[in-house]
Every structure is written in structure tokens, then in C-alpha cells.
Amino acid sequence: MKTSVRLVLAAGALAAAASVAQAQCISKAGKGTGGSDDSAKFQAWEAVLQGTDWSSWASWMASSQTVGQAPGYKVSNLKSRCSAGGWLGRECVVGAKLCKD
């Protein structure tokens, strides 16, 4: 009986650890508009960061302001798609996977 309880507890701990590891990463996308692709991507990346972590967004605004960078996160699978549209002429969607450092 003790062995069964230990196995159940160990399995539960492993499952919890796995879910915590997965919770460290998130895939997000944002949409932005601007007069150029660069400005629309900037707005879209802001939306990604604001939807992920406000403190990362604040650090980003105070530092690089480079699309694809996120203070405190490793960014991968960065993709963007832009087209004519939006209030200012160009509309972009930017998406990425962000994993907490």
C-alpha cells in the first residue's frame, strides 16, 4: 500500500512539474496598424507583449523597442504578415512563442 501511495505521489509530482514547464511558454499574436509595415509591426508586437507580461512590455518600451525582443523571455517562431488596410494604410499581424527565461 505504501508503495502504491508513493508511486501516485511521484506521478503527481512529475505531472505538476511538466505542467509548470509548459506554462513557462506561451504563443501569442497581435494585430497593429500604421503608415508603414514597420510601424504596424511595432504596434502588433506591443499587443503581443501587453497580452503576455506588462512588465516585459514596460522594459521593452524603455529599452530596445525592437520587434521580436521581449525582456525576460526567449522569443522563437517569430512570424509576421502585413497587408493594405487598417486606419493608417498598413495592417500587420505578428506572432511568436515566448518562453520565460
Spans of features found by a protein language model:
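Bacterial N-terminal signal peptides
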Residues: V8-A16
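Short, well-ordered alpha-helical segments
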Residues: S27-V67
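C-terminal alpha-helical interaction appendages
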Residues: A23-K28, G86
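C-terminal edge-of-domain segments
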Residues: K74-D101
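Bacterial N-terminal signal peptides that target proteins for export
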Residues: M1-L9
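Acidic-leaning, charged glycine-interspersed low-complexity segments
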Residues: V67-Y73
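Sec/Tat signal peptide C-region and signal peptidase I cleavage site
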Residues: A16-A23
